């Protein structure tokens, strides 16, 4: 896929965020509707997306292939956690800001942007592997995400029973054992889950509407974070996978592309829900998403 094809995909993402921004400025969306939309996404729509991604159990890779992809996932998240332990100390900032740095380094926008870009680059087969790589994201993001963003005092073990966590565990079992869901159920889950991307992008755009954009562009910390998130981490992952030979070339390339995605949109929803730094998180998402219009096509052209 050419640089300009991937570039076009990224412009679509930004257009939807701009629509959310405009809707907030015109009064169609407010802080209250943002909170309600956040709960709707985390409680119903995102779980449907997670379950729908493995609804066609007979077309997923074999159990052995899934376990092989999970090995790549261990390297993927291991690198993310390693960087999250070091980089925030260099960037500095308040405790909740450092929570944003850590979350941004560990969790990229693997599903909302990663799925369509992976399929566009590597074909429909890539979706199956991307789904498996995203499964640990769902478990880690919705369990550790509140802890990272809001601090240990805000963490409750009941969060492990959130709809997204439960859906992720079920999805992993469905994938490993190739359980076939009824076709109608799969269609319903996929249809409802398909609302995730536009609604999430509208939500982020609405959150950005009340923020001073100058801070995102003038903060050296955010620029350093964006460089690490979008360029350094993907290159480090590519070098490690190539050196160790973990995973097939296709799976390795998919993992690198997913690592090159901007900060996960889920961060805004989780920061709002659990009392994290919503402003800093939204700025991280905005700047990394904006910069990824250039960095993702560049990395894709090099693979």
List each language-model region with its residue ranges.
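Alpha-helical transmembrane segments of multi-pass small-molecule/ion transporters
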Residues: 1-303
């Amino acid at each position: 896929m050419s640089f300009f094809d991937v570039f076009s995909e990224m412009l679509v993402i930004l257009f939807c965020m701009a629509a959310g921004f405009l809707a907030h400025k015109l009064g169609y969306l407010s802080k209250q509707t943002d909170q309600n939309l956040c709960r709707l996404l985390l409680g119903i729509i995102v779980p449907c997306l997670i379950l729908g991604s493995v609804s066609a159990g007979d077309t997923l890779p074999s159990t052995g292939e899934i376990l092989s992809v999970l090995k790549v996932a261990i390297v993927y998240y291991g690198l993310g956690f390693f960087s999250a332990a070091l980089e925030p100390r260099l960037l500095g900032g308040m405790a909740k800001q450092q929570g944003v740095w850590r979350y941004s380094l560990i969790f990229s926008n693997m599903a909302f942007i990663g799925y369509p870009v992976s399929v566009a680059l590597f074909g429909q087969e890539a979706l199956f592997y991307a789904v498996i790589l995203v499964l640990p994201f769902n478990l880690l993001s919705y369990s550790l995400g509140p802890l990272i963003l809001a601090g240990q005092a805000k963490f409750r073990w009941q969060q492990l029973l959130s709809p997204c966590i439960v859906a992720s565990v079920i999805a992993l079992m469905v994938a490993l054992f190739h359980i076939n869901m009824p076709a109608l159920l799969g269609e319903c889950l996929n249809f409802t889950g398909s609302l995730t991307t536009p609604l999430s992008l509208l939500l982020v755009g609405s959150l950005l509407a009340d923020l001073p954009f100058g801070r995102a562009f003038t903060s050296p910390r955010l620029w350093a974070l964006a460089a690490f998130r979008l360029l350094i981490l993907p290159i480090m992952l590519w070098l490690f996978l190539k050196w160790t030979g973990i995973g097939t070339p296709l799976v390795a390339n998919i993992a690198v592309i997913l690592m090159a995605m901007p900060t996960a949109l889920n961060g805004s929803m989780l920061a709002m829900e659990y009392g994290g730094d919503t402003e800093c998180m939204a700025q991280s998402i905005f700047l990394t998403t904006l910069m990824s219009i250039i960095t993702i096509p560049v990395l894709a052209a090099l693979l």
